Amino acid sequence: MRTLWQHCHVATMADGRYSAIEDAAIVTSAGLIEWIGPRAELAPVEADRTVDLGGAWVTPGLIDCHTHAVFGGNRSGEFEQRLQGVSYAEIAAQGGGIASTVRATRAASEDELFASAHQRVQALMRDGVTTLEIKSGYGLDLANERKMLRVARRLADELPLTVRATCLAAHALPPEYAGRADDYIAHICDEMLPALAGEGLVDAVDAFCEHLAFSPAQVERLFIKARELGLPVKLHAEQLSSLHGSSLAARYQALSADHLEFMTEEDAVAMASAGTVAVLLPGAFYFLRETQLPPMDALRRHGVKIALASDLNPGTSPGLSLRLMLNMGCTCFRMTPEEALAGVTVHAATALGLGDSHGSLQVGKVADFVAWQIERPADLAYWLGGDLPKRVVRMGHEISN
């Protein structure tokens, strides 16, 4: 079906800029953008349907390129403890922290995980999200990582959005491998990844490169295996310290390196050369009350593409609003509203390996877009909360009005 969408203004986000078109029209057909431009330049078109957008601003559908949306349990009690002065180490010694989420996730059935994740993902969708990534990483064994990734696939099947599933088995050391990190990495490489990839459950491979998680050498073993399996890689890097994990990610042409508060100029140069996207996660920065800022000037100076994401997870960023992350990116990291919007559209698409099909409003790309009740694109980063989406369109079909 061919649809003409008109009486709107468009921020195409081509090349990471607003690239605004006033009084625009969009023609969609077969799920793709067939034509876009000033309405005055549109030749007569035979449309099956014409939609008047009432002067709304239209942007690409938002893309949340880093989430841990599938998990069991709830850690709000730990939030209260931390506000009362209990340290993370003390909470962990009590059996809390990521270990508590692993226990709850392992104990939950696939249907239970699906039901809770479904609610969280729907909250993101109400904010204009049409594409998101979901990581595993709270199962930490084959059966439970499979369970999490199956939930991600089910969400893609049952909700009108695009989901990319990332295997993050190298998120933390499971209790049964305490003190044996090398053995656990070998288990992931020899058994878990081949099995999960063989079942078609994995779109990318991620790891957590930190002193409290896995070393660069261990991560590299994982990357080598991912490359053998034909899977792209991503990396949690430089969140708490500088191990040059982002440079390691760049050497393996990673789609992205994420967090990056402690990255160096050398890391930025490597990422720029490899085309690796810097995914910044202001929700975790805010929630943990961190003080070390990502090196924004170095990222800009070397032309590294910058994305933003919610990092939705139960321990460090229980954020259900990607639009809130736009504001946090501006207020916490000194991004411009234009940079922030590019960070959840065109650059987020690149961070998921979808840059050729998603993330900007251009002829031939997927017709995912949002019509917003705003006066200008900067409003998306300006307003805190509120119901701003007027219509959400995925593959040329309205999913919200």
UniProtKB/Swiss-Prot annotation:
Stored InterPro entries: Amidohydro-rel, HutI, Metal-dep_hydrolase_composite, Metal_Hydrolase
Coiled coil: none
Any single Gene Ontology cellular-component annotation: cytoplasm
Principal cellular location given in the protein's record: cytoplasm
CDD domains named among the record's database cross-references: Imidazolone-5PH
Binding residue positions for Fe(3+): 66, 68, 236, 311
Pfam families: Amidohydro_1
Biological pathway: Amino-acid degradation; L-histidine degradation into L-glutamate; N-formimidoyl-L-glutamate from L-histidine: step 3/3
GO molecular function, one term: iron ion binding
Domain of life: Bacteria
Protein family (similarity comment): Belongs to the metallo-dependent hydrolases superfamily. HutI family.
Name of the protein in its database record: Imidazolonepropionase
